[in-house]
From Swiss-Prot:
Reaction catalysis annotation: D-aspartate + O2 + H2O = oxaloacetate + H2O2 + NH4(+); D-glutamate + O2 + H2O = H2O2 + 2-oxoglutarate + NH4(+)
Disulfide-bond pairs as recorded: none
Source species: Caenorhabditis briggsae
Gene coding for it: ddo-2
Protein name (Swiss-Prot/TrEMBL): D-aspartate oxidase 2
Organism ancestry: Eukaryota, Metazoa, Ecdysozoa, Nematoda, Chromadorea
UniProt similarity note: Belongs to the DAMOX/DASOX family.
Keywords on record: Cytoplasm, FAD, Flavoprotein, Oxidoreductase
C-alpha cells in the first residue's frame, strides 16, 4: 500500500517539505492542505533575500544556499524567482554585524566590512559600520508557484480545507502528517504556545535603477525585485492586525528616504502586510499520536516557526523534516 502523507500549509515551508518528500519517497501519495489562496498567504510577498538571524540555523541556511545556487545555474530566473543580488547592511552596533558574519559570512559570496571611504562615498547618512555581501534572493510570488509546478509534476495534490484538528486528517487515511502551518503551527499541534505573530508591512515602489539591497539595523531595508523595489518594514511582535495604516506608510517612507534621499516621493505600486510566524526556535520534531475517535495511530512531523527566515532556511529544514517522515515510515 502506498504511504499517504498530508502536508498542512502551501507556503514556502509546506511546498518545500512536500517537494523533498516526493523526491525522497517517490511511491508516496501526498496531499497539501491549505486554508486560503496562495496569494493571501505570508509567502506571497517577500523578496526572499538570503539572510540568517540566528547562528544555530547556519547549516540549514547553507543547504538552502546550495539549492538556490543550483536553481540559479540551471533554470531561468523568470521561472524560479531566484536571482543574485549584492548589497549592504548598516548598523551602529558592530557586534550585530559580527553576529551576521558568524551566521552566514562563509556561506554567501564576497562578505566583508566596508572601510570608511566606502561608507562615506556610498551612503548619504551612513551608520558607523557596514557589511557587504552577494547572495540569492527568491521572490515569493514566483518561487513558491515554481515549487508548486514541480509538485504537480510529482502528482502531489492540493486541497483547500481549513484543518483545525490533526486527528481528522489521520482518520481520513493519512499515515504521516507534516505540520507546516506557520503561525498557526503551534495551535494546530495543540501542545505549543511559543508561536506569536510578527506583523510586517512592505511597500513596493517603482525604482528600476535601484539594483542593490540596503539594510539599516534589520528593520529598514530596500530590496530589488524583478519589477519593483521592496521597501520596509515593520517588525511588530504580537500584533494581529493586517490593515496598513497611514502611520505604517509614513514610518516606512521616512526611514526609507533617510537611506535614499534621491528617491523622495516614490511611486507606490503595491502594499502588502503579513504575520510572520515568530518562535524562539524552529520546531522540527516528530510525535506518535492516536486519534480520539477511531484510535488510529499516526505520526505528526512538526516543521514551523521560521520567523522572517522561511525562504532562507526552508530547504535546509525540510531536509531534516523529510528524514523524520522517512523514519516514521520505516524507510
Amino acid at each position: 500500500m502506498l504511504p499517504k502523507i498530508a502536508v498542512i500549509g502551501e507556503g514556502v515551508i509546506g511546498c518545500t517539505s512536500a517537494l523533498q518528500i516526493a523526491k525522497a519517497i517517490p511511491n508516496s501519495k501526498i496531499t497539501i492542505f491549505h486554508d486560503k489562496p496562495f496569494e493571501n498567504s505570508c509567502s506571497a510577498g517577500p523578496a526572499g533575500l538570503f539572510r540568517i538571524d540566528y547562528e544555530e540555523n547556519t547549516e540549514y541556511g547553507r543547504a538552502s544556499f546550495a539549492w538556490f545556487s543550483h536553481l540559479y545555474r540551471t533554470t531561468k530566473g523568470a521561472e524560479t524567482g531566484v536571482k543574485l543580488v549584492s548589497g549592504h547592511i548598516q548598523s551602529d552596533n558592530l557586534e550585530s554585524l559580527k553576529q551576521q558574519q558568524r551566521a552566514y559570512g562563509d556561506i554567501v559570496y564576497n562578505f566583508r566590512f566596508l572601510d570608511d571611504r566606502e561608507r562615506l562615498d556610498i551612503f548619504p547618512s551612513p551608520s558607523k559600520h557596514c557589511i557587504h555581501y552577494t547572495a540569492y534572493a527568491s521572490e515569493g510570488n514566483k518561487y513558491v508557484p515554481y515549487l508548486k509546478r514541480l509538485l504537480l509534476e510529482q502528482k502531489v495534490e492540493f486541497q483547500q480545507k481549513n484543518v483545525e484538528n490533526l486527528d481528522t486528517i489521520a482518520d481520513a487515511g493519512y499515515d504521516v502528517i507534516v505540520n507546516c502551518a506557520g503561525l498557526y503551527g503551534g495551535k494546530l499541534a495543540g501542545d505549543d504556545d511559543q508561536c506569536y505573530p510578527i506583523r510586517g508591512v512592505i511597500l513596493e515602489v517603482d525604482a528600476p535603477w535601484h539594483k542593490h539591497f540596503n539594510y539599516r539595523d534589520f528593520t529598514t531595508f530596500t530590496i530589488p525585485k524583478e519589477n519593483s523595489v521592496v521597501i520596509g518594514s515593520t517588525k511588530q511582535d504580537n500584533r494581529w492586525d493586517l490593515e496598513i495604516t497611514d502611520e505604517d506608510r509614513n514610518d516606512i517612507l521616512s526611514r526609507y528616504i533617510e537611506l535614499h534621499p534621491g528617491m523622495r516621493e516614490p511611486k507606490i505600486l503595491k502594499e502588502w502586510s503579513a504575520l510572520r510566524p515568530g518562535r524562539k526556535h524552529v520546531r522540527i520534531e516528530s510525535q506518535q499520536r492516536k486519534t480520539t475517535e477511531t484510535g488510529k495511530e499516526y505520526t505528526v512531523v512538526h516543521h514551523y516557526g521560521h520567523g522572517s527566515n522561511g525562504f532562507t532556511l526552508g530547504w535546509g529544514t525540510a531536509i531534516e523534516a523529510t528524514k523524520l517522515v522517512k523514519k516514521a515510515l520505516g524507510l
